[in-house]
UniProtKB/Swiss-Prot annotation:
Pathway: Cell wall biogenesis; peptidoglycan biosynthesis. Belongs to the MurCDEF family. Cell wall formation. Coiled coil: none annotated. One of its GO terms (molecular function) is UDP-N-acetylmuramate-L-alanine ligase activity. The keyword Flavoprotein does not apply. It is found in: Cytoplasm. Keywords: ATP-binding, Cell cycle, Cell division, Cell shape, Cell wall biogenesis/degradation, Cytoplasm, Ligase, Nucleotide-binding, Peptidoglycan synthesis. It comes from Streptococcus mutans serotype c (strain ATCC 700610 / UA159). The lineage of its organism: Bacteria, Bacillati, Bacillota, Bacilli, Lactobacillales. GO terms for cellular component: cytoplasm. It catalyses: UDP-N-acetyl-alpha-D-muramate + L-alanine + ATP = UDP-N-acetyl-alpha-D-muramoyl-L-alanine + ADP + phosphate + H(+). ATP binds at residues 119-125. This is UDP-N-acetylmuramate--L-alanine ligase.
């Protein structure tokens, strides 16, 4: 196990099986920055995390048995098993020991004061915000679910995203943790919202010094932990209350109080009600951890967001927003943010459902969420490698349930999107929705050859 107290063995390579995964790529970057030799393997298909890996000079290899050797520490992505990956199969058959991502991380974080961010939605944005503020105040290492990682050997703090899928967060015992919400997702694993709650309740019991949870979530109100639980939100019965909220096209301004103690006014250059909550969670955590509020206030103002969370670009005077939203709750939050920043523009949603199981389980909720847009376009369902399409649901089934104008498009023909004027285009999904986005960008660029 790698710790900062040990002499670095610079000849030992750390090999990541599935290095393009968002958590894996972030961890690879972190260890690379700490001075370790890092490499990894994955499929050839482009994934947005590989830009950072390539920029750092980290080798990305095709999957091959020859990648596995005696002189390395192996970290395997959670999705890779003996029956679907030749490297995992080779390692198991030949006695090579490896750790799963979450197992490695659970041991690694023990050398720091660790701050986790869990929740069904908003983990990545909140982790990014917490890491941004803390790294500008003191030496901080972090892992963010957008594939971003930073490693400093002398860090006091370690900020990380804590994922509930398949209960992967159970090896984690952080000093502090934010939990943004509890909601039913991952129907391929969880049996229902009560099963999700049970997982989060088990995780909460492992937090050591302080738990910060959204007070208006009825499931979060039922959590139990030996650590103090602090509720944040908009209601007077919360421990940390955000109030006097002013939403504008420049972001959100608000005040926070803790009991009778006024913590002051804050600004975050982010949009949507959910981002006020995320910022309040960060403020609460850092206040209890003893961080000076003037410093928190100063660095909240300079947060520029995380990858694939309301990421904006301008192509020929057309605004395109890229977002990872793949659950109805996330879609509503993203469209709310778009309306805050662009109140006078038509909001056009382009959404790709992610996994057949989720689409079946939440079909009506997806339709209701997408009705928050002015117009809707749907891409074909992106199936997970963990499931088989039995033909039980088609994207047209979702289109039929949407009240607003809704059409199905293909990646080869996105020209129907040109029918809108004075519009903002919001591309949402966790699959390959960016292929549709790139097709639209190319179409716009070819119209005037004036890309900026």
């Amino acid at each position: 196990m790698l710790t900062r107290g040990e002499e670095k063995n610079m000849s030992k390579t750390i090999h990541f099986i599935g290095i393009k995964g968002s958590g894996m790529s972030a961890l690879a970057l972190l260890l690379h920055q700490m001075g370790y030799k890092v490499q990894g393997s994955d499929v050839d298909k482009y994934y947005f995390t590989q830009h950072g890996l390539e920029k750092a000079g980290i080798p990305i290899l095709p999957f091959a048995e020859s990648n596995i050797t005696n002189d390395m520490e192996i970290i395997a992505g959670n999705a890779f098993r003996k029956d679907n990956n030749i490297e995992v199969a080779y390692a198991l058959e030949n006695g090579y020991h490896f750790k799963r991502y979450h197992e490695f991380l659970g041991e690694f974080m023990n050398q720091f004061t660790s701050l986790g961010v869990a929740g069904a939605h908003g983990k990545t944005s909140t982790t990014g915000l917490l890491a941004h503020v803390l790294k500008n105040i003191t030496d901080t290492s972090y892992l963010i679910g957008d594939g971003t990682g930073r490693g400093l050997a002398n860090s006091q703090y370690f900020v990380f995203e804590s994922d509930e899928y398949e209960r992967h967060f159970m090896p984690y015992h952080p000093e502090y943790s934010i939990i943004t919400n509890i909601d039913f997702d991952h129907p391929d694993y969880f049996t229902g919202v009560d099963d999700v709650f049970a997982a989060f309740n088990d995780y909460a019991k492992q937090v050591k010094k302080g738990l910060f949870v959204y007070g208006e979530d009825p499931y979060l109100r039922k959590l139990t932990s030996s650590a103090p639980i602090y509720y944040y939100g908009f209601k007077d019965n919360d421990d940390f209350v955000a109030y006097d909220i002013m939403r504008s096209t420049n972001g959100s301004d608000f005040k926070v109080r803790h009991g009778q103690n006024e913590l002051g006014s804050f600004h975050v250059p982010a949009f949507g009600r959910h981002n006020v909550l995320n910022a309040t969670a960060v403020i609460a955590n850092l206040y209890i951890a003893g961080v000076e509020m003037d410093l928190v206030r100063q660095h909240l103002k300079t947060f520029s967001g995380v990858k694939r969370r309301f990421s904006e670009k301008l192509i020929n005077d057309v605004t395109i927003i890229d977002d990872f939203a793949h659950h109805p709750t996330e879609i509503i939050a993203t469209l709310d943010a778009a309306r805050q920043k662009y109140p006078s523009k038509e909001i056009v949603a382009i959404f790709q459902p992610h996994t057949f199981t989720r689409t079946i389980a939440l079909l009506d909720e997806f339709a209701q969420a997408l009705n928050e847009a002015d117009s809707v376009y749907l891409a074909q369902i992106y199936g997970s490698a963990r499931e088989v399409d039995h033909g039980d649901v088609k994207v047209e089934d979702l289109a039929d349930k949407i009240v607003k104008p809704a059409k199905v498009i293909t990646v080869d023909n996105v020209s129907p999107l040109l029918d809108h004027h004075n519009a903002v285009y919001v591309f949402m999904g966790a699959g390959d929705i960016q292929l549709y986005e790139r097709s639209f960008e190319e179409l716009l660029s070819n119209l005037t050859k004036n890309t900026r």
